[in-house]
Amino acid sequence: MDSMTLFIASFAVSCIGALASVLLIKADNAAKTAGCLIGAVAAVLSFVAGIQAVLGDATSVDTIVFFPFAHFQLLLNQLSGLFVALISVLAFAGSIYGLNYFDEYPGKKGRAGFFFNTFVASMMLVITADNVFWFLVAFELMSLTSYFLVVIEENENSIHGGWLYFVIAHVGFVLIMASFLTMTNFAGGSFAFADFRDTQFSPAVASVCFVLSFFGFGAKAGIIPLHGWLPKAHPEAPSNVSALMSGGMIKIGIFGILKVGLDLLSASGVQVWWGLMVMVFGAISSVLGVAFALQEHDIKRLLAYHSVENIGIILLGVGASMAAMALDSVGIAVLALMAALYHTFNHAMFKGELFLGAGALLYSTGTRNMEKMGGLFRRMPATAICFLIGALAISAIPPFNGFVSEWFTYQSLFNAAMQGDKAVMIVAVFAAVALAITGALAVTCFVKAYGVSFASAPRSEAAANAKEVPAPMVFAQGLLAAICVVLGIGAPVIAPVLVDVAASVLHPYGGVFAAEGMELMNQYSGAATSTPAIAIALVVLVGLACGYRKIKTVGKVQKSQPWACGYAPNEHMPVVATTFASEVSWFMQPLYTLRDRCTAVCWSIAHFFQKLTGVAEAVEPVPDKVLVDAPHKGVEKLADLATKLEGGNYSIYICYIVAALVVFLVLAVQMG
């Protein structure tokens, strides 16, 4: 069975899972079980389809469905197959996890099953759509279904977080649509992506389209300064949904940037400054993301900020690849893109595991506040071990997967800096320094997160009474933790496959590019691909250390309370999250001020959107609503907008400037 047949079957099964959840909605547990189990089956099918595509079984579909002007075109190639496989793993783990975790939402389990399956199906359609119309339809469906999952608790925090996400998502949607429609206009009015690939746009048009799509998809990916919705929305969603959003959905932002910059605009050629811009935003996002995470005590907000950090790391590889491609350094371009794709998959796995671990802590203790945890290693050992693996992976500790992809990213940046272009050299060195700072702060942050949550003594009654989560939740965490280990130790096998995927993106004659990328990878990847040896050495050393300790301490170990300067130990004495990061927080206070201002801008956009659209407060007769109220409110809104032009709100002024700039750019391109 070919990859497209399997993919369509998985899509149909996801739709069946969503339908089953709705039909059984009055039987809460049955709806949950049906939605989760059917969703797991769909994920297995789509994973197999994705892997087949990655290994070279690229297929497509082109047929007319509903709209003659927009053919239903799907393309499952090596790049889209990789993202399909990535989301499938998270969807499978999330479905199994949901068998117990959705019990936290009584009366809403059927709703959760429906939106979860629809969310997964819409992401799959976004990745494979090969037509503007269906891409935008699927993208909007993805945003809407994830919004309803964010607000499922229907409390004040979830509604506020969901609203901010909804607005930023649609700001991004408008920018993406503007980019695609501009390409459509210059491609003879065609909606087919295939025609975009064959059209040689002028440098100005290509640049406008890329910039619009970069910020549009960047809003979905959570790059700074469009990141404000992540720490608001991710903590409010169910934890398996948070894992899918952070591990999967924001990667669609990366997919979109790659698709436009390196695929749809391929006939026009990549420009050096595109890569430099991407690297600069990547460096800023990586450093600020981890700096903001350090100050957090809410474990899910902390993980959300780390998503910003890792999106930044991925963009470093993407930007280096674009810059190298523009300079005809194809080997470096392939190496850098391979590093970005590797880290994309790696981040999905360890961030998915960490969010599931955070959900397990919330499930057992009833809180996301790390200050109220402590001592959970003894009470939740399986969760503690899985979370530790995720923490080591995200901190880039060998032999785990985060180390491998970050090592390749370093090598691609160093090689890009030596290509002779002064601007590329400066930005690449800046990016490498930013990556080093990010790595150091990430280790600090996860020593804090793990130590405060799992070590020491319980600091609340809930932590003292915590128990290990049910088996399905442990299995889901263990699966993703095991994949983190496999992706690290299996680097010698996995990296060449990803080199082939990267080469297929950068050039239709991928074999030539793959050979150059493979040669460069073999030259500079010794440490990254030696992870099996590192793993064996670590196992041997740990075994020797444990054996030595066992022999030396036989009959000599006595258990006693820790020394506390003569005072009786209590739960308030251990170092907590606040004091652990106090020195770093003091040093980086200006960055936290910047974060507050960025968040304020996001909220200003949300409030502006809310005032612009208005909110229906009551049900009224349709004729009155249409004939009387609508014109009246239209005049009022025009008057309010005229007044707000001089309202003194600088954030709104910025919105006007950006909107006007986009309009003028589009008009200038069309007139030129």
Q: Which stretches of residues belong to each language-model region?
A:
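Hydrophobic transmembrane alpha-helices and their helix-loop junctions in integral membrane proteins
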Residues: 93-110, 116-135, 145-468
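Membrane-entry segments of alpha-helical transmembrane domains in multi-pass membrane proteins
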Residues: 1-9, 72-86, 125-137, 272-277, ...
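Membrane-interfacial helical/loop segments at transmembrane boundaries in membrane proteins
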Residues: 59-68, 192-198, 408-420, 494-524
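Aromatic-capped, Gly/Pro-kinked transmembrane alpha-helices
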Residues: 493-536, 547-672
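Hydrophobic alpha-helical membrane-insertion segments
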Residues: 37-50, 170-178, 387-399, 476-499, ...
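Hydrophobic alpha-helical transmembrane segments
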Residues: 74-88, 203-217, 423-439, 515-542
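Hydrophobic core of alpha-helical transmembrane segments in multi-pass integral membrane proteins
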Residues: 15-19, 39-50, 91-92, 180, ...
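Transmembrane helix-loop-helix hairpins at membrane boundaries of multipass inner-membrane proteins
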Residues: 1-9, 16-114, 186-200, 500, ...
